[in-house]
Amino acid sequence: MSDITKRALSASLKSLLLEKPIDKVSVLDITNRCGVKRQTFYYHFQDIADLVEWTCLDDASKVIAGKKPSSWQEGFLEVFNLIKQDKAFVLNIYHSVSRDKLELYLYSIVYRVIKQVVDEVSSSYSVSDEEKDFIINFFKYSFCGIVFNWIDKGMVKDPKIIVEQTSSLCSGLIVRALDNLGVKHN
């Protein structure tokens, strides 16, 4: 029951963000839209920033629990599509004091996508977990930078084109990084 209430509050917040910026949304607006009392909100969340963080983490967990992408390109495109589905929410959060919540959300999703690829490719290499984590984080920050730039410019450019351009630039880089750091087994 608790998650149902949290998701209802989250849906109310997202709905309100279609109408006004986050700094104009109050707890009362959210609870009225949701049909619950203010105490219910405060039972689950400390403040709106806490709800934003929970919403980001909940959305990320849905993606993480979903099907495994067949390639990093498919996973990266999935990230763009997820963001575009919640465009009003993402843009509002991106341009607010809660931007760090959105960044953590994106970092966790992109980390998962890159980790799957690195884990699969690195199985034939002798590389430490620390070295793999360095590679994953390198690509995570690179890819998130591209996503943040896209958000900053209003999400206008077609995500498929961005993924194709990124793929052209990054083709073979994970394998090359593993070649440079590890010993390949035949």
Predicted segments, located by residue:
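Amphipathic alpha-helical packing segments from all-alpha helical-bundle domains
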Residues: 99-124, 130-145, 175
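An amphipathic alpha-helix adjacent to DNA-recognition modules
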Residues: 3-6, 10-14, 18, 23-27, ...
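An amphipathic alpha-helical interaction segment
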Residues: 85, 137-146, 164-167, 171
